[in-house]
Amino acid sequence: MSLFSTPGGFGTGGGSMFGSTATDNHNPMKDIEVTSPPDDSISCLSFSPPTLPGNFLIAGSWANDVRCWEVQDNGQTIPKAQQMHTGPVLDVCWSDDGSKVFTASCDKTAKMWDLNSNQSIQIAQHDAPIKTVHWVKAPNYSCIMTGSWDKSLKFWDTRSPNPLLTLQLPERCYCADVVYPMAVVATAERGLIVYQLENQPSEFRRIDSPLKHQHRCVAIFKDKQNKPTGFALGSIEGRVAIHYINPPNPAKDNFTFKCHRSNGTNTTAPQDIYAVNGIAFHPVHGTLATVGSDGRFSFWDKDARTKLKTSEQLDQPISACSFNHNGNIFAYSSSYDWSKGHEFYNPQKKNYIFLRNAAEELKPRNKK
């Protein structure tokens, strides 16, 4: 019996196998292309939690839709289902049991998509587009956290039309992450707030941004005991900050590094500097991936402060990325991200989602 009630949600045809070949520069890494990708820019990707057998991938797009694929062991992708918003979808997440997907949109709503019944219902409302949505699973409660451009962070019981709690933000929410019992929200004007989620969500600390330019993406990382201990923050200026919440030596432990830059290295030959569009931590090794407007992905070891790999350059930006639950698959999307304005938008250009075998490339290198 299929997990979903609809065996063929959208599109036709099957995906290619691992080790497929590419003929042009839209796929220079020769990674697997996901079948029937969205028809407009892909804003977010999320793999299913380990509670589900197999691997399922969710993508949200500026075509107002959310799509789900089953990813088989051989790399083939099977379209399973699709839901719509009335505005672009900006974020997606899963419930911890894998039965529901939550979607956030420019239509100012968040929805809960029951994958077994393929029904979607509204569960959140803001006064402006909702930029982030996260599932919070605590010992004594579970809820949805939404961050909006209306400068608020709201927590919702999916059975109630009113929020459990509303927290005011200093500015518009640009990106967020949750790893219980910690949440981090980055806002416009370089605002940065850490929340604790035990018992009831509350503000823990406001942090002076380690970055000098607009925040673009954030991801929480864990320590060796599997507890959230800090976060990586990416900006539009081709830079990532690694920030620990309570480091033994803040001046030494917290640092930033440059990435997603090209060409020159000094004032006589200026660099091209690109936005960091996404950050994802490997669930096993704790290493991280960054993707950027330069059309490349890079893998990093933050503890050794080394780069593990940089991809060849795709012919358009990489807009989002995600690891599956055991870190064997790295998904990344190739879409225009509007970083160069409307004059660089080519409506004829296709959007792609690629799958890469990430089992080996994200391993920390052995210290000499």
UniProtKB/Swiss-Prot annotation:
Q: Name one GO biological process term.
A: cell division
Q: Where are the WD repeats?
A: 37-79, 84-114, 125-157, 168-206, 215-255, 271-301, 310-346
Superkingdom, taxonomy of origin: Eukaryota
Composition bias, kind Gly residues: at what positions?
Answer: 8-17
Q: Cite the SMART domains for this sequence.
A: WD40
Task: Provide this UniProt record's keywords sorted from A to Z.
Answer: Cell cycle, Cell division, Cytoplasm, Cytoskeleton, Mitosis, Nucleus, Repeat, Transport, WD repeat
Q: Where is this region: Disordered?
A: 1-37
Which Gene3D superfamilies does the UniProt entry name for this protein?
YVTN repeat-like/Quinoprotein amine dehydrogenase
Q: What Gene Ontology cellular-component terms does the record carry?
A: cytoplasm; mitotic spindle pole; nucleus
Where does it live in the cell? Cytoplasm; Nucleus; Cytoplasm, Cytoskeleton, Spindle pole
Pfam families membership:
WD40
Matching entries from PANTHER family are given as:
MRNA EXPORT FACTOR AND BUB3 (PTHR10971)
Q: What does this protein do?
A: Plays a role in mitotic bipolar spindle formation. Binds mRNA. May function in nucleocytoplasmic transport and in directly or indirectly attaching cytoplasmic mRNPs to the cytoskeleton.
- Tell me the protein family, please: Belongs to the WD repeat rae1 family.
What is the protein name stated in its UniProt record?
mRNA export factor
